[in-house]
């Protein structure tokens, strides 16, 4: 076993006629990537989902959730909820923009000085031509 164990070498031990190792791994069914990993490390990586396993042990999403829970503001049921429906926006931003544009267009047409007088959102007052 003093051979070069580089990831580019693809020589398989042909002394084992059945293709099984002493751990019971069938080398003939391994992908080239798995074969390289097995030759380099002597074992195959775990097949379980690591991220899901980590999320089961996690109690809080971040320090803010921990602080709110400790203060009693939220219940433990509300801390981590994997609900995809919460990611949806409450309003349609493009519809909101359209309504604002329509409102501005309707208020700017005809009687502009009367309807916009005293309005907070009308912007700065018009300048006199002398200044």
From Swiss-Prot:
This is mRNA stability protein IGO2. Residues 106-122 have a biased composition (Low complexity). InterPro entries: Endosulphine. The modification N-acetylserine is found at residue 2. GO terms for biological process: cellular response to heat; negative regulation of nuclear-transcribed mRNA catabolic process, deadenylation-dependent decay; positive regulation of G1 to G0 transition; positive regulation of mitotic cell cycle phase transition. Keywords: Acetylation, Cytoplasm, Nucleus, Phosphoprotein. Required for TORC1 to properly control gene expression and chronological life span. Plays an essential role in initiation of the G0 program by preventing the degradation of specific nutrient-regulated mRNAs via the 5'-3' mRNA decay pathway. It is found in: Cytoplasm; Nucleus. The modification Phosphoserine is found at residues 6, 63, 108, 119. GO terms for molecular function: protein phosphatase inhibitor activity; protein-containing complex binding. Belongs to the endosulfine family. Residues 1-26, 81-131 are annotated as: Disordered. Phosphorylated by RIM15. Residues 1-13 have a biased composition (Polar residues). Coiled coil: none annotated. One of its GO terms (cellular component) is cytoplasm. Present with 1400 molecules/cell in log phase SD medium. The lineage of its organism: Eukaryota, Fungi, Dikarya, Ascomycota, Saccharomycotina. It comes from the Eukaryota. The keyword Acetylation applies.
């Amino acid at each position: 076993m003093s051979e070069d164990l580089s990831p580019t070498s693809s020589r398989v031990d042909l002394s084992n006629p059945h293709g099984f190792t002493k751990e019971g791994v069938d080398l003939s069914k391994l992908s080239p990537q798995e074969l390289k990993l097995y030759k380099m490390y002597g074992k195959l990586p775990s097949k379980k989902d690591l991220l899901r396993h980590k999320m089961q042990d996690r109690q809080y999403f971040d320090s803010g959730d921990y602080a709110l829970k400790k203060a009693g503001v939220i219940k433990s049921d509300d801390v981590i909820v994997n609900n995809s429906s919460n990611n949806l926006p409450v309003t349609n931003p493009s519809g909101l923009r359209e309504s604002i544009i329509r409102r501005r267009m309707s208020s700017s047409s005809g009687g502009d000085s009367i309807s916009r007088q005293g309005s907070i959102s009308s912007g700065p007052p018009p300048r006199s031509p002398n200044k």
